[in-house]
Amino acid sequence: PKDVNELKPYYLAWQGGDWANRTQCMVAGTNDWRQNHAAYNRGEMDKWAMANTPYSIGYVHEADIPVQYKLAEAFTVGDMYYESIMSSTAPNRVSWFSGTINPPKGSKVNGTNKHMGGPTLDNRDSVGCERTDSGKPFSCVPLRWKTVPEYLQEAGISWRVYQDKDNFGDDPLVMWKQYQTSAKKKGDLAQRGTSFPGLQKFFDDARDGKLPEVSYIVAPMQLSEHPPYMPMDGAWIQGEVAKAVMHGKNWDSTALIYSYDETGGWADHVVSPYPPQSEESEWIEDPYDKSNGITPIGPGFRLPFYIVSPWT
C-alpha cells in the first residue's frame, strides 16, 4: 500500500461482512522457485510482501476453515512439517512419490539429467529439458528413476492411487517413463498408479475393508483448494475421506495422513532446517537467477499436516 514501508501479518477478512467468503478464493501469491527463494532471502525470510505479494502474509481464523481445523484439533498435528522442495507443485509431488528430484550433484540416480530426467524444479511436464544460460539441462522429462510405489510392490506391499479423471494433473507418476510404457501395455504399474478408479472406489473400499496397504488420494481440481478453488470446497473431501475411513472395517489399523504438496504462496516466518552446503545433493546453482549462487533445494516452508487414526 502507498506510504507503507512495513507490513505485518493480518487477518485476510478484516473488513468483515461477506469478506470471509470473498477471501476463500483469493490467490496468496505464487509458489514457484523464483518467488519462494526470493522471499526466503538466504534464511532472512523477510521478502514475502515484496518478492511475492502483500497477500502472502495474511491469515485466516478457525471459523474460515472449520472442518480442517476440527480434524487437526482432534488428532495429531505435525507443526514442523515442511514441503520437500522450495518450489511449486510438480517438484514436491515428484519428491513425494520418489524421494528425490534428481539433483545434478550427489544424486543416487545413475545417469545424466538429460537421460534420467530432472532435476525437477518447476511444473514442466512436456518431453525435453529446460536449460540455464550456460546450457545446463534441468526439469527434463520423462523421468526414469525408481518410484516409491515400485519399491512397495517389490516388497509385496499393496498400493493404489485413487483419483478421478479431473485430477488437476496432480498425479506425477505420469511423468515417469516406466508408467508411460506400462499404460501402453495396460500393465500393473499403470493400473495401480495412473488409471482413474474414482474416489467412489476409495469410499467403497474403505467401507468394505478392501483398501490396499498404502493408498494415495489425488483430489479433483474443484476440491484441491488451489485458488480459485476454496478451502470450504476442500473441506468436503477431507471430511468425506475421514468418515469413510472411520466407518470402515479397517479403522482400527489405519493411519490417514493429510497434507498439501506446497505452500500456495503463503508466507512463513520459520526457517526450514536445510542441510549444510557440504551435502551437495541438497544444494544447486540457481538456474533462474545467477545472483543467488548456490542455494538450497529444500526443505521449503511449513505445510499443514495431520494424522487421523485411532492411535493419534
Predicted regions span which residues?
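N-terminal pro-sequences and low-complexity stem/linker regions of secreted or lumenal proteins
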Residues: 1-312
